[in-house]
Amino acid sequence: HYIPRRIEDGYGLGRDAILSLHGQGVRLLVTVDCGITGVEEVAYANSLGMDVVVTDHHECKEELPPACAVVDPHRPDCGYPFKHLAGCGVALKLVLALGGESREEALLSRYCTLAAIGTAADVMQMSDENRTIVSRGLASISRSDFIGLHALLHEAGLSDKTVTSVQIGFVLAPRINAAGRMGAADMAADLLLCTDPHRAEHLARELCALNRERQAVEQEIYSQAVEQIEETPPQERSALVLASDTWHQGVVG
């Protein structure tokens, strides 16, 4: 897997990331939650001999990327009835389609919990298929075989508790997102992929520590922003743009 570094790489599919992956011998690139506007980037990957499959849930532009396949419910020619899947929901659909009807139930049982967490964390419209994904995924979270997820639940104080979408949004998601915000995005992925219980415990503790660091940085930025507002004369407050060279890019965005 490759997760773009928020500060160094920016968001979405980037040429530097494509070149790096090509150098590692990657010949098939599957995007998740990005790439629908990456026409030039996908063309660049093609020029390097890479096949690209784009999965995304953002609105399409007039020109689609020249990928082998573009999976997005917002495609003008897509007849899929539910248009509000999260990026992880679209990825789940691809997994189910590739697995075939005979494996659909097994794959859904394994991956629905991760899709539920992603859907709730992305604050998607909680209706129709999203509601089904979240309801089923959270109902089976205690039976999930993802060791890293159980380690994170334990470290977050949610072991042996009924996990709701609210707890996903305010407890689990901030810890998972903290890795990317603080410049260590791979840590969250490594945790979810981890098969060693001891390493999973270590990564979960590190992730929670990063989240506490993120909270402290965020609070400091907030205090400085309030100070800037208070120093601005009332007659100049009709519209305010606050900035500082010292504010952490991963936290303000």
Where are these regions (language model features)?
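Hydrophobic helix-and-loop "lid/oligomerization" segment in the mid-to-C-terminal part
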Residues: 1-28, 48-49, 66, 100-253
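Hydrophobic, small-residue-rich alpha-helical packing segments that form membrane-like cores
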Residues: 1-90, 107-109
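Hydrophobic, well-ordered secondary-structure segments
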Residues: 39, 88, 92-95, 117, ...
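Metal-dependent de-N-acetylase/amidase catalytic core
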Residues: 81, 94-103
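Catalytic-loop motifs flanking and including active-site residues across diverse enzymes
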Residues: 86-94, 168, 251-252
